[in-house]
Amino acid sequence: MAGLALLPDIWLWHLGVSGWPLALAILWWVPSLLLLLAEVGLQMGFFHKLSVRILFTTILFSVMPKVVFILFDFMMPWFFALLPALALMGWFAFGFIEGWKRLEIRYVTYESPDLPPYFDGYRLLHFTDFHLGSFPKDSDFVQKVVDAANNEEPDMMLFTGDLVNNDAREVEPYLETLKQLHAQDGIFSVWGNHDYCEYGNNHTIAGLRNNWKLLYNYQCQLGWHQLMNDHFTVSHGMASIDIIGVENAGQPPFSNRSKLPKAMKGLGKDGFRILLTHDPHHWRREVWDRPIQLTLAGHTHAGQLQIGKWTPARMAFKEWGGVYRKGSQMLNVSSGIGGSFPFRLGAWPEMTVITLKRTLK
């Protein structure tokens, strides 16, 4: 990535930057040097959080504006070509300053003849990818999310992973706030790739196990039902639905810890089932051939950047955000709440309210 990102610098260097005073010419290469160091840091496992932030900040504020300038420079004088590049930088600045706080609620209806009559009109709140370690310590955004979730008065809340970035202790400042989340039939959760706290190269087996234990205990303190390749049946009288949860079902380079057959063990042939899984790749890979009506996932963040229907998430995911259907099955991929760094533009932070409706067979 860093090699490609250097191309605009090389082009502009030969276009005229090489003639600048020495001090300015040296400053010109500073963003590219930071980008190169950040990519090396990520590849080597050093300073993961800092490297991610430097990498994406330099791409957004250095590489992309330079590309825009070069494109417009072919069509107009350089001082006019500078305007769209500066406008792009201002747009990205909004994403860093305000965009990550612009919470939205998306509403979806899922209809199924398999839904028991009691659950007709039942409301689920799907939220995912908090990445608590990315928020400023004095941020009231987490409280805003909690209030918005509770205001929807859902019957059940479902969280599909990545509560933290790389350390279970990221939960600690927000523990009392998250305890305020409430739903009549409870809050169910699964773990995402970040929750295993494996990023970087400074981990010991003992340290990892301590992180896992801490995160598990934190979610227990929150009152969340963690489904680790397991299921839970929610019953009201004779009516029931099954909530299935798997550990991270990642594709390389992410680990695959999911065991869907184990999670479904003991379930009958019939029934209405909701699967919680972090990575939406799992839907095509293993869920299509199973009697699971509704699948909820996150992980993609919708690239944290969306312009119209374009997002970088499209390059990695066939199902990157919103609702997808195959026959009677439905997948909802939420773009999530946070990210590895506090930036959102177009792909605003979101939660999804899903209303279940019973239809006749």
Question: Which sequence ranges carry the predicted segments?
Answer:
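Non-catalytic terminal accessory segments
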Residues: 1-103
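N-terminal signal-anchor transmembrane helix
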Residues: 48-55, 75-152
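Soluble catalytic domains of enzymes that build or remodel membrane lipids, polysaccharides, and related
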Residues: 118-361
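Short, structured coil/loop segments at alpha-helix boundaries
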Residues: 17-24, 28, 48-49, 76-80, ...
